Each structure stands twice: as C-alpha cells, then as structure tokens.
C-alpha cells in the first residue's frame, strides 16, 4: 500500500472516456439525456478515483453540474475526469465533457462538474487515501479551490458550521 505522505500526481488519475450518442440515449429533441450523461460521468469519476486510491470507492456527492450545450444524436461524448484534491478518506474529481460532431469536424464544451468519492476498505468502510500532488497551473488552481468547495458542501449538508469554514470566510473578509 502506498504511503499517504508520498502521494500521487493528479495526472495519474486522468481518465478519458468516449461514447457515441445513440437513439436510445436521446430525448424527443434528439439531445443526449442528462441522466445518461451523468451515468457516464459517474463511471469516469469512479475510475479516476480508483486510479488514485487503488481501492473501490463510491459516489458521495455531485456538485455544480452545469449543462452548457446539448450533445446531439450521432455526436461523440468526450469525458475527462481527474482527481483535483484528496482529503482523509474522500477525493474531489473534476469532470469536463465535450461533444464532438464528427460530420462537421468540430467539438464544443458541454458540461462540467465536481464529484466527491469516498474510498472503501474490503468491509465497505471509509479508508484513507494518498495525498494528491498537483503539478500544472490548472491542477494547482483546482487543488486550491477544492477546500472551499468542500467546506461549502459540508455546510450545506449540515456537517460544518459556517463560522468554522475558514477558507470560505477568507473570501469575504
């Protein structure tokens, strides 16, 4: 088992998935259904989490899921997921989604979200995860913002008092 002190690079968790949007994946307007996309995003996030912690994990929350542009029937869904911060037993995974129109040869940003996964031991109990080592400027930016996003999640879940959210308070002082 890897030591939490050493950590793993964010890039080691990068997961890329591609799916073709078929008729069964679409609504009456020919757009990819949001639930199907969320299913694929959850799979990508789970794989990224597994690459980071080398153990099964489960979805704990989904935050800031935005739908910017619909993905049409026949287009390819391109999903990239990467762990952006590791806490004690949980990991925040950033996911970006693009649509690729192969016929007209262009791609467009479609969705973005943050998933939180909790690592599990063989008995299904939370277990510690390795620290995360951000390397690129983007990875460092996501890493720095993850603590604020986590504090907001904990406040909204009633697990943290707003006065204890030091990172969030610093934004307003």
What are these regions (language model features)?
Residues 26-38, 170-173:
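A conserved, well-ordered hydrophobic junction motif at loop->secondary-structure transitions
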Residues 20-25:
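A short small-residue
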Residues 2-17, 72-73, 84-173:
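HotDog/MaoC-like acyl-thioester-processing domains
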Residues 29, 39, 67, 114-117, ...:
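Aromatic side chains
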Residues 9-12, 32, 43-80, 84-85, ...:
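Hydrophobic beta-strand-centered segment that forms part of the acyl-chain substrate-binding groove
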């Amino acid at each position: 088992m890897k030591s939490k002190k050493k950590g793993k690079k964010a890039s080691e968790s990068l997961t890329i998935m591609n799916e073709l949007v078929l008729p069964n994946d679409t609504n009456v307007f020919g757009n990819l259904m949001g639930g199907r996309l969320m299913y694929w995003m959850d799979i990508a996030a789970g794989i990224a989490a597994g690459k980071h912690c080398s153990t099964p994990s489960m979805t704990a929350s989904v935050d800031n899921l935005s739908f910017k542009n619909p993905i049409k029937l026949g287009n390819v869904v391109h999903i990239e997921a990467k762990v952006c911060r590791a806490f004690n037993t949980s990991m925040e995974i950033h996911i970006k989604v693009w649509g690729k129109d192969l016929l007209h040869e262009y791609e467009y940003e479609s969705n973005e979200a943050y998933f939180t996964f909790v690592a599990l031991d063989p008995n299904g109990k939370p277990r510690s995860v390795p620290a995360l080592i951000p390397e690129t400027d983007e990875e460092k930016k996501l890493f720095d913002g993850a603590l604020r996003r986590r504090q907001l999640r904990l406040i909204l879940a009633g697990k943290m008092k707003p006065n204890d959210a030091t990172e969030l308070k610093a934004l307003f002082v």
